[in-house]
Amino acid sequence: VTSIGMYAFSGCSSLTSVTIPNSVTSIENYAFCRCSSLTSINIPNSVTWIGVSAFKGCSSLSIVICKAILVPSAGKDVFAYVPISSAVLYVPDESVDIYKYMEPWSEFGTMLPISQVPTDVEDVQISSDKDASVKKVIRNGQVVILHNDKSYNIMGQEVE
């Protein structure tokens, strides 16, 4: 697969997380448009183009990891109707300064180097609570942290 086709996953309301394969070089127009439950996207270094409205209306999107050292070209309204001002964008350490000046990437509320992506349970911070118990489990192939009857992913987001 070298391209995620036009409208390929558009409207998939049950899609919560996407990791694009390393073989992909382009994400076409409206590919993930209106995936309202999508919370995170992982874009590989191989992607050079992201089409018009590719992630438009992904209203739950809060984390984007873009591993492309060379900033991918982007069509119009890639993140329209996405709360990117409160989302986190992780980019290659050596490219942070470039992404800061390139649209639509510059619109993200928080931009951090990829080296700061939480990678394990040890990176999750939970406020001190004397009676709390924290337990790491694997659920559906994902690491989940259980804390006071709630479940969290390794990014610290509450999950069901």
Locate each region found by the language model.
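Structural signature of tandem-repeat unit edges
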Residues: 1-3, 12-26, 35-49, 58-73, ...
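C-terminal outer-membrane/trafficking sorting elements
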Residues: 118-160
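Short, T/G/N/S-enriched strand-turn elements that build extracellular solenoid repeat scaffolds
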Residues: 52-56, 73-81, 100
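A recurrent domain-boundary module in secreted/ectodomain proteins
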Residues: 101-120
